[in-house]
Amino acid sequence: MVEPTGIEDVQEYDENSEEYPAEYTTETPETVGETYIPTAVGPSLGTGRRKTAVARVRVVPGTGEWKINGKSLEEYFPNKVHQQLIKEPLATLGFEGAYDVFARLNGGGTSGQAGALRHGLARALAAMDPEHNRPPLKKAGFLTRDARKVERKKAGLKKARKAPQYSKR
């Protein structure tokens, strides 16, 4: 036999009514008219790594100029996919055109260097104003080091994992 729980008066609320409990809503309150203005004055440094590439990045408040090993972003990375990948941390924070980026890249190929530059840029932006910049960059995954590297070739195998054809007889 089921015993009564003592909860017999259950109220149902309309979401639009004033009586609707605020703690049940999942919407976050919007900050109306508040836009964050960066206050950084000096340069910010960040080191990024991806595969075997290393990027040393310096971010300075400016006009959106890019210098990578003495070349512009479009010269150094002609591939639009790499350019978009690199600019993602600035786009996430809404800082496109607000900072000049100077970077020294070495090691690895184009894809690894693009990933290293994005990682270094995200670290530099996070170091600039950790309170405001770090949470969105962390949530987007830009501050996480991608630890994947090429696996070494093993003796007796053709590649890292590819074995020669096996014959039973």
From Swiss-Prot:
Signal peptide: none annotated. InterPro entries: Ribosomal_Su5_D2-typ_SF, Ribosomal_uS9, Ribosomal_uS9_bac/plastid, Ribosomal_uS9_CS, Ribsml_uS5_D2-typ_fold_subgr. Keywords: Ribonucleoprotein, Ribosomal protein. One of its GO terms (cellular component) is cytoplasm. Residues 150-169 have a biased composition (Basic residues). GO terms for molecular function: RNA binding; structural constituent of ribosome. Residues 9-21 have a biased composition (Acidic residues). Gene3D superfamilies: 3.30.230.10. GO terms for biological process: translation. Residues 1-29, 128-169 are annotated as: Disordered. NCBIfam families: PRK00132.1. Belongs to the universal ribosomal protein uS9 family. This is Small ribosomal subunit protein uS9. It comes from Thermobifida fusca (strain YX).
